[in-house]
Amino acid sequence: MARYPSVDTRRLFGYLAGYPFSPETLRQLKEQKVDLLHSHCPVMSTILARSIRDVVDAPLVFTYHTKFDVDVAKLLRGRLLQESALYVLASNISACDEVWVVSHGAGENLRSIGYQGDYQVMENGVDMPRGRVSEEAITAATTDYDLPEGVPVFLFVGRMMWYKGLRIILDALKLLQAGGQDFRMVFIGSGADAAEVQKYAKPLGSKCIFTGAISQRETLRAWYCRADLFLFPSSYDTNGLVVREAAACDLAAVLIDGSCAAEGVTDGVDGFLIDENAGSMAAKLQKICKRPECMAQVGCQAGDRLYLSWGDAVKRARERYGIVMENYRMGRYDDHHRPMDGVLNAQGSIMDALAKLRDLGDGLAERYREGWDEHREGIQERRDEFREEFQERLEEHREGRRAFRTELKQKGEALWQKLDRYL
């Protein structure tokens, strides 16, 4: 593994952005035996991979799993800027040898930003094992919260961002509350909109619970097992891993019909589908709450039909990697973007050369500092030796003066004694 430095862009994007022209990273990667390059970022990581692709002689795979047109629209003002940014993204993705998407909807979104090539649908798996945790584990995780028996528990897990469909959830629950249906709604996660979401949920009172982020996977599993329904009305997500995490615990999800998260879900069989509005969700929840046995049955079907383990997903990826490397060896990939790869590689080489010059300069400066330090130490030693010699001679001179005064005094006293005898 070769790590490379990053730039703090959390205020803009919520995460760090890598710096693709790190000389040290380029040197490390060029020295390693690389069979295949796989990027999950259409900008920095892909630029880094392209800059070394010809040097390491390996194919480049890219996975698209975020609706970047939504992010670009939020970050950039002005249609021209947005279109230019999306063009750069699509061009960079098109330069990869093979493109993977995490859902058919993600592929359609990729097409909408200007990508015209082929792609492979490679679904993500989840690291949660299939099956429920013990009742003791559920009690330990949820005991501090007001969850009365017999009252439906709805669950959301994810970032506290409005684009996750949180307003639809809260508005639907307000309609449900107005209709006299009791419930508990549990939100697990954190995010930039958390404070606004909690304020918007105030009219629901104690029926709405915010736990904050939970990083312990077993605790999260316990919450999935305690809930009766998983609410995820997001049209932003391209795959919805949390839907499959819920399915791992036999928990059915309420999803937007036609969304990426709802791919492969059949209404009333292994999940519940609604239109993208609060009224549709409220009507669906009102109907489901009257049939609690239906929630459990559909949840089991979700586990059987939707669950995909991380191990199975990795196995599929490894099998596809073999096909990619074979296609690369046989020259089946288009190389019309290779000249630009050369430019990127040249940029990396320039950065590497500059780094070497900097290192050389640092080395010369270090040797100069060492020589100056030795010279300064020599001067200090000679100064100390002179001081010691001067002190010794000064002390000898003082001793001589004291001895002379003593001798002179003795001779004077002897002379006065002789004079006293004659006088």
Regions found by a protein language model. Name each.
Residues P59-V61, D69-S91:
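Nucleotide-sugar donor phosphate/pyrophosphate-binding loop at the beta->alpha transition
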Residues I93, A213, A222-A227:
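Short alpha-helical donor nucleotide-sugar binding micro-motif in glycosyltransferases
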Residues W100, L147-K174:
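Conserved donor-binding/catalytic core segment of Leloir-type glycosyltransferases
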Residues G105, G125:
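Carbohydrate-associated surface elements
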Residues A195-I214:
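Nucleotide-activated donor-binding/catalytic signature segment of Leloir-type glycosyltransferases, i.e.
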Residues S235:
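Aromatic "clamp/platform" in nucleotide-sugar-dependent glycosyltransferases that forms part
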Residues A252-I256:
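Short hydrophobic beta-strand element within catalytic cores of glycosyltransferases
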Residues D267-G268, F272-A278, K287-P292:
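Conserved acidic donor-binding segment of nucleotide-sugar-dependent glycosyltransferases
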